[in-house]
Every structure is written in C-alpha cells, then in structure tokens.
Swiss-Prot record:
Ranges for region Disordered: 1-23
Species: Dictyostelium discoideum (Social amoeba)
Gene Ontology cellular component terms for the protein in this record: catalytic step 2 spliceosome; cytosol; pICln-Sm protein complex; precatalytic spliceosome; small nuclear ribonucleoprotein complex; U1 snRNP; U2 snRNP; U4 snRNP
UniProt keyword annotation of Nucleus present: yes
Name of protein: Probable small nuclear ribonucleoprotein Sm D2
Biased composition range(s): Basic and acidic residues: 1-15
Amino acid sequence: MSRMNDETMEDKPDDSNGPLSILMDSVNNNTQVLINVRNNKKLLGRVRAFDRHCNMVLENVKEIWTEVPKTAKGKKKAKPINKDRFISKMFLRGDSVILVLKNPLGAPPQAN
C-alpha cells in the first residue's frame, strides 16, 4: 500500500464500529431502525442515506405518537390514544434526533 493510501485510511473514520454504525448497517442491509425524535414521536423506517450530523433520508416510515384528548373540568382523565401515519419518503434533520435503535422487533430486510 502506498504512503498516501495509509494517510487517507487514517483520516477516514471507521463507520463500521463507531456511533454511526447502526445507520451504516441499515443502509447496507436495508434493515429498519427506530428513531426517537424531539417532538416526542417515534419513526420506524429504513435509512437510505445519512451524514455525520445525523441528517437522514428515510423510506417506508411509520410515525408513531400518543395523544391525550382534552377533557372538561370535573370529568375523568381521558385515556391516551396511540396514533400513527405512513410516510413513503422523508428527510429528517439531524438536530431533532435523540436516539437511534435497531428495530427491536427485528423485521426482515425488504427487497428494493
């Protein structure tokens, strides 16, 4: 290996072992990730692309959140309602990302 290649290899971060490895694994293997975002919603989808700021392009996303209906004074507390919606493609800005997990249910990879 030439000297220039050695220097280039040293400067390049290793995404296979670092904190972005879950995102890299999702891109390479087409696996789902669960992303907790700042608006108290969860995104379950497949990562198509990402950068070091955790900006992401996601596909086949299920957005999940809980709403508590408002009640009149003196009435019982309303039960929380789980809601979700499907988003085929989206761009997620990295500053809203709190946590990224491999899909806890382990859904199989989806063919393109």
